[in-house]
C-alpha cells in the first residue's frame, strides 16, 4: 500500500504539473502569435513609411543645404591667392624659397567672402588683341614697367599696358628669338613638338608667340608682391599657372611636356644635388628638349654683363654639362645665347648608369610613383621612364594634330581604360560640346578665351573645342584615377589639383569654368560652399560656368550660386537625362561697396 500510495501521490503531483505546462505552452504560443501580428503590422507600417519617403524623394530628390550668405572681402584682397598668400610668407622658411610654395590656410582661417575686382576694373580686352595689350586697372602693377623698361617686357600707355614682345634674352623681340630656336629645333615646325613649359615665364611672351606656331605652353612663375607675371599672362589670354620648383614636385605627371624652356630664369640648376633639373627631366617626354638661354650659356661673350668672372661662368657651364650628361641629356644644338639639350629617347643610357654603383644621380627606386605630384617632395634621383611604354617618346608620339584623337598608350594604365573607352569618350564630348554651344552661344566667340575643365577624365571637352579661339586648363583630381598623362599625350595641357583647396591662380583669370560631376565625386571630402567660393574667385566678372551635376545637387548649387551674385538657369542635358541637370550660370560684374570708405 505504501508503494501504491507513494505512486499515487507522485501521479497526483504529475497531473497538477501537466496542466501548468500545457497552459505555459499555450500562453507562449499565444504571445508569439500576437507578437507576430504586432510585428507584422509594424513591418508593414515601416515599409509603407519607406515607400512614402521614397516617393517623396522621387518628387524632390535633392540635397538640402543651410542657407549661406557671403560678405565682400576688403579691397586689399583684390588679388588674394589663398595658398600662396604673401601675408603668410614670414611663417615659412626662406630655404630654397619654400615660402613661395603652396601653403593653404586651415578651415578655421579660410576667407568666406567675395573677392572684389580692383577699382576701375573693365571687362578684359578680347583675344587676339589681348595678346598685345590689357587694361592697366585690371592688373595695376607698375614694377615691371619701371624696373624692366629698357627690356621692353611691357610699357604703360594711357589706360593700357602694351606688350611689345621684348624680354631679357630677346632684345630684338620674342618672334626673332623663337625663329632662331626653330632653326635649332626643326621639330618645332612640323607638329612634333606640341606641349611646352616655360619656367620663370616673365609676362609669358614666349608662350604667347608659340601659340601662333601651334605649340601650347604652360607658363609657370611664383606668386610675388610686385611683378604679377602669371596674372599678366592670363589677362593676355595665355595659359599660365602659379608655381615654383622648390622642395616639391610640380603638379604634372612624368613624361608629359615635349619641350621645357628657361630664359634667364635664374634657377640655380646645379645646386642642391641638381634636384631642380631632375624635376625638369621627370616631366619632360623621352626625346624631349630642354632649352636654356642666359647664364651660363655664351658666357665667353656675356660674362661681363653678368657681374661675375669668366672663370666662374666657365665652371658653372661645365658643372651644368656634367649634370645633364649624368641624367642622359645630350647637347642637341647651340647658337649665340641659346643652348638645347635632348633627353634620351630610350632607356639604354639609364641602363648603363645603373651599372655604376657610384653614379650620381642614382635611379629612383620603386617606392615613389613617377606620376605622384601632389605635395610630393623632390628627390635627388633620376625618374627612369617605364620600359613597358614603347610609344611615349617624342619620335613615336603622333604629330599634332593627329595625336589629339589617337588612343594614347598610357590609357592602359587607367583602371578600365582602353581604346574603346577612349573613342567613346571622344565622341561623347563632341556631342556635349555641340549642345553646350546651343545653350551658351558665347562659346566659340571672342567672349570666352580662358577655359578650365575642373574635373576632366581624358580632356574630351578640350579636344571638342580645339578649333575655337580658346584654350583649356584640364584639371584632374589628385584623388581620382590618374588620367592626366592621357591628356598630355593628346597634346593638351592640365594639372593635378585637390578642389578642397584653392587653385594656383590669381582672381578673375578664367572666362568659363566647366564642372562635370565634381560635387558628386567630392561631396564626402569638400564643402560645396568653399568649392563654389573658389570658383567665384577665379571666374572673371561676366564670366560663365557650366555645371553638369546630378539632380540631387543641382538645386543646392543654384542656391549657393545666387548668394555669389550669379544668375543661373537649369537646362536639360543633351540626352534629357532625369538624373542629371545642367546649370548655365553667369557671374555678375560688381564693384566693392567698401572701396570708397576704405580710401577716405
Swiss-Prot record:
Q: What's the protein name?
A: Probable methyltransferase PMT21
The cross-references to InterPro entries, in alphabetical order and at most eight, read: Put_SAM_MeTrfase, SAM-dependent_MTases_sf
List the disulfide bonds in this chain.
none
Output the GO biological process annotations, alphabetical, semicolon-separated: methylation
Specify the glycosylation sites in chain numbering: 594
Where is this chain's protein located in or outside the cell? Endoplasmic reticulum membrane
> Which Pfam families does its entry note?
Methyltransf_29 (PF03141)
Q: Which gene encodes it?
A: ERD3
Q: What induces this one?
A: By dehydration stress.
Q: Which principal EC class is assigned to this enzyme?
A: transferase
Q: Which organism is it from?
A: Arabidopsis thaliana
Amino acid at each position: 500500500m505504501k508503494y501504491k500510495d507513494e505512486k499515487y501521490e507522485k501521479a497526483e503531483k504529475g497531473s497538477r504539473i501537466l496542466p501548468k505546462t500545457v497552459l505555459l505552452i499555450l500562453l507562449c504560443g499565444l504571445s508569439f502569435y500576437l507578437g507576430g501580428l504586432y510585428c507584422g503590422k509594424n513591418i508593414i507600417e515601416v515599409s509603407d513609411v519607406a515607400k512614402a519617403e521614397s516617393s517623396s524623394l522621387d518628387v524632390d530628390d535633392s540635397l538640402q543645404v543651410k542657407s549661406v550668405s557671403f560678405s565682400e572681402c576688403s579691397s586689399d584682397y583684390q588679388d588674394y591667392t589663398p595658398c600662396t598668400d604673401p601675408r603668410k610668407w614670414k611663417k615659412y622658411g626662406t630655404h630654397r624659397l619654400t615660402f613661395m610654395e603652396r601653403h593653404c590656410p586651415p578651415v578655421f582661417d579660410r576667407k568666406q567672402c567675395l573677392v572684389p575686382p580692383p577699382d576701375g576694373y573693365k571687362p578684359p580686352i578680347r583675344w587676339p588683341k589681348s595678346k598685345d595689350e590689357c587694361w592697366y586697372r585690371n592688373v595695376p602693377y607698375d614694377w615691371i614697367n619701371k624696373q624692366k623698361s629698357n627690356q621692353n617686357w611691357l610699357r604703360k600707355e594711357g589706360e593700357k599696358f602694351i606688350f611689345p614682345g621684348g624680354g631679357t634674352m630677346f632684345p630684338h623681340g620674342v618672334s626673332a628669338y623663337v625663329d632662331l630656336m626653330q632653326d635649332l629645333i626643326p621639330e618645332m615646325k612640323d607638329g612634333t613638338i606640341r606641349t611646352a613649359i616655360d619656367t620663370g615665364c616673365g609676362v609669358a611672351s614666349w608662350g604667347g608667340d608659340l601659340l601662333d606656331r601651334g605649340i601650347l605652353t604652360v607658363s609657370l612663375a611664383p606668386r610675388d608682391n610686385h611683378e604679377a607675371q602669371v596674372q599678366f599672362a592670363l589677362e593676355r589670354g595665355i595659359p599660365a599657372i602659379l608655381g615654383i620648383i622648390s622642395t616639391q614636385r610640380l603638379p604634372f605627371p612624368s613624361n608629359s611636356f615635349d619641350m621645357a624652356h628657361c630664359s634667364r630664369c635664374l634657377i640655380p640648376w646645379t645646386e642642391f644635388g641638381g634636384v631642380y633639373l631632375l624635376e625638369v627631366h621627370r616631366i619632360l617626354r623621352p626625346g624631349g628638349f630642354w632649352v636654356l638661354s642666359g647664364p651660363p650659356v655664351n658666357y665667353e661673350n656675356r660674362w661681363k654683363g653678368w657681374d661675375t668672372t669668366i672663370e666662374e661662368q666657365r665652371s658653372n657651364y661645365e658643372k651644368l654639362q656634367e649634370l645633364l650628361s649624368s641624367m642622359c641629356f645630350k647637347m642637341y644644338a647651340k647658337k649665340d645665347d641659346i643652348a638645347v639639350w635632348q633627353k634620351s629617347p630610350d632607356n639604354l643610357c639609364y641602363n648603363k648608369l645603373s651599372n655604376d654603383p657610384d653614379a650620381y644621380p642614382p635611379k629612383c627606386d620603386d617606392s615613389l610613383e613617377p606620376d605622384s605630384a601632389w605635395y610630393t617632395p623632390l628627390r635627388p634621383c633620376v625618374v627612369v621612364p617605364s620600359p613597358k611604354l614603347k610609344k611615349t617618346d617624342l619620335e613615336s608620339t603622333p604629330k599634332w594634330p593627329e595625336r589629339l584623337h589617337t588612343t594614347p598608350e598610357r590609357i592602359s594604365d587607367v583602371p578600365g581604360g582602353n581604346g574603346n573607352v577612349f573613342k567613346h569618350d571622344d565622341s561623347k564630348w563632341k556631342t556635349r560640346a555641340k549642345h553646350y554651344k546651343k545653350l551658351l552661344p558665347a562659346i566659340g566667340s571672342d567672349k570666352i578665351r580662358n577655359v578650365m575643365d575642373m574635373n576632366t577624365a581624358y580632356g574630351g571637352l578640350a579636344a571638342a573645342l580645339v578649333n575655337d579661339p580658346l584654350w583649356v586648363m584640364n584639371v584632374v583630381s589628385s584623388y581620382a584615377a590618374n588620367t592626366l598623362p592621357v591628356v598630355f599625350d593628346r597634346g593638351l595641357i592640365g594639372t593635378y589639383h585637390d578642389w578642397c583647396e584653392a587653385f594656383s591662380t590669381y582672381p578673375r583669370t578664367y572666362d568659363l569654368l566647366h564642372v562635370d560631376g565634381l560635387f558628386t565625386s567630392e561631396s564626402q571630402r569638400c564643402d560645396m560652399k568653399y568649392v563654389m567660393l573658389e570658383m567665384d574667385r577665379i571666374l572673371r566678372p561676366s564670366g560663365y560656368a557650366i555645371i553638369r551635376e546630378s539632380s540631387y545637387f543641382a538645386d543646392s548649387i543654384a542656391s549657393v550660386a545666387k548668394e555669389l551674385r550669379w544668375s543661373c538657369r537649369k537646362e536639360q542635358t543633351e540626352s534629357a537625362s532625369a538624373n542629371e541637370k545642367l546649370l548655365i550660370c553667369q557671374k555678375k560684374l560688381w564693384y566693392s561697396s567698401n572701396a570708397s570708405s576704405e580710401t577716405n
